[in-house]
């Protein structure tokens, strides 16, 4: 492939990012031609009100509460007499929760913030389907602990464009986009970094723009945490020594030749020797 013939990557923020920032309002499609059954809790005509009593000093649930209240407003159910009691109960596994729909109230309980978040999303989906909720107990827990995805337009810092998402001003994680990911069950996102971009006592020339990278990384971590999403840094390290774009230049090891291990690919590359003391110290 002739990479020189490829067009340049578009500059600036893609236009579709503005679409990602927009909220998609709830539109009712309820079947109101029937009355509620005796074993159902009807949310009509009075509506429901959220009563959060779960301890959350870091305010990680603020986004989930705001999202739920906005949904109630769009569904014309806010400020009603039926309470949704959100409380802490010990003994649940991580992210597990119990949603109890009673005759006159709804109780959501969990042992951690993410269980409450998942429970609110589940309750929202139940109400979106019908304002008549069948009374009973819903005990739920995730069957997959780490549900990791990736920003669909986030660069991976590889040829031909080599764009580093931590070095530009593009917002890859708008609030509404994160809200949608969280609703779909995503609790992790990954992004790419390289050791050569981080400060190193073994390679003093590295990490020139580390402060800028780490500042945006911290901002991303903090924003995603508000939606129950962790950030995973992908590091395919240590690199080989050689002349390819994916390798560490051989001259970088001129002061530490012990870092160059076995020769491979007819001598074109040298492995990074982690068995030496210098090698073990080279990891950030």
Each language-model region and where it sits:
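Feature activates predominantly on carbohydrate-active enzymes
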Residues: 20, 25-30, 35, 55-57, ...
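N-terminal pre-domain segments of enzymes
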Residues: 1-46
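Generic detector of low-complexity/intrinsically disordered segments
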Residues: 5, 43-45, 62-63, 74, ...
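Structured segments of extracytoplasmic/periplasmic soluble domains
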Residues: 67-75, 126, 180
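Short Lys/Arg-enriched alpha/beta "domain-start" segment
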Residues: 37, 53-73
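Intrinsically disordered, low-complexity boundary segments flanking structured domains
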Residues: 34-40, 72-77, 86, 132-140
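Short, well-ordered secondary-structure micro-motifs within conserved domains or adaptor modules
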Residues: 50, 70-95, 99-103, 107
């Amino acid at each position: 492939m002739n990479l020189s013939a490829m067009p340049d990557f578009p500059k600036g923020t893609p236009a579709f990012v503005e679409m990602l920032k927009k909220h998609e309002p709830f539109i009712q499609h309820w079947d109101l031609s029937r009355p509620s059954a005796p074993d159902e809790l009807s949310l009509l005509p009075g509506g429901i009100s959220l009563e959060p009593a779960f301890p959350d000093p870091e305010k990680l649930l603020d986004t989930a509460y705001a999202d739920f209240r906005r949904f109630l407003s769009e569904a014309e159910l806010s400020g009603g007499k039926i309470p949704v009691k959100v409380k802490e109960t010990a003994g649940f596994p991580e992210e597990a929760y119990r949603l109890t729909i009673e005759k006159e109230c709804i109780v959501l309980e969990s042992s951690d913030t993410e269980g409450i978040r998942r429970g609110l999303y589940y309750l929202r989906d139940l109400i979106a389907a019908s304002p008549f909720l069948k009374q009973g107990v819903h005990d739920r827990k995730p069957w997959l602990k780490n549900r990791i995805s990736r920003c669909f337009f986030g660069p991976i810092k590889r040829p031909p464009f080599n764009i580093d998402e931590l070095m530009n001003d593009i917002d890859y994680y708008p609030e509404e986009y994160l809200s949608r990911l969280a609703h779909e069950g995503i609790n992790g996102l990954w992004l790419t970094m390289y050791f050569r971009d981080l400060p190193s006592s073994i390679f003093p020339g590295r990490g020139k723009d580390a402060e800028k990278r780490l500042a945006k990384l911290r901002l991303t971590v903090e924003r995603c945490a508000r939606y129950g999403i962790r950030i995973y840094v992908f590091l395919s390290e240590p690199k080989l020594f050689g002349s390819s774009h994916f390798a560490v230049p051989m001259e970088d090891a001129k002061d530490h030749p012990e870092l160059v291990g076995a020769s491979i690919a007819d001598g074109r590359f040298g492995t990074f020797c982690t068995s030496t003391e210098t090698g073990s110290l080279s990891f950030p």
